[in-house]
Amino acid sequence: SGKDSFIWPNSWIVLVGLMCFIVYLAEGIMLDWSALYLIEEKHIATAQAGLGYASFSAMVATGRFLGDGLVQMLGRVRVIVGGGLLAAGGVALSIISTHWGVSLLGFALCGLGCANVSPVLISSLSKQTYMPTHLAITAATTIGFAGVLAGPAMMGAVAHYSSLSAAFAVLAGLLLVVAAFGHRFK
């Protein structure tokens, strides 16, 4: 039937998508910019520059493996708010540190913070009744994945006109926005 062929997402679904956009933006920036950041800003050897994304990714994987238990223990709101704060704090730590090793720790904390935010956000769409769940998930993840695709280019523009540290500071600020809106997911 043509009943659910196209439905504009409502503001709740768009909010979930935008919050996922920010979290996926963090992943895209870590993938595309962390090595260059470590080389240019923290003076790490080129051969070790991949450690930035590796530390981020390892903690995303670890966090996801522990995710169900964390959500049961802490609840959805604390996972989103705490994850946003931890991720923002990790990025901030990487900016203010003077040693690349501390920046790696910051990237790891960012990964741990981001790990369960998007899964919790996406799972929240099962509670909405505006549109069929599969369409709501599709709409939100489409918005979210634009963060991986377009985000690094946007941050590249920020870095071009200022610095890589400024681009990472923008990311930290956006992750604080995720934390600020986390209370809406009770």
State each model region's role:
Residues G63-G75, A159-H160:
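Helix-to-loop junctions at the C-terminal end of transmembrane segments
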Residues T129-L164:
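A late C-terminal transmembrane helix in Major Facilitator Superfamily
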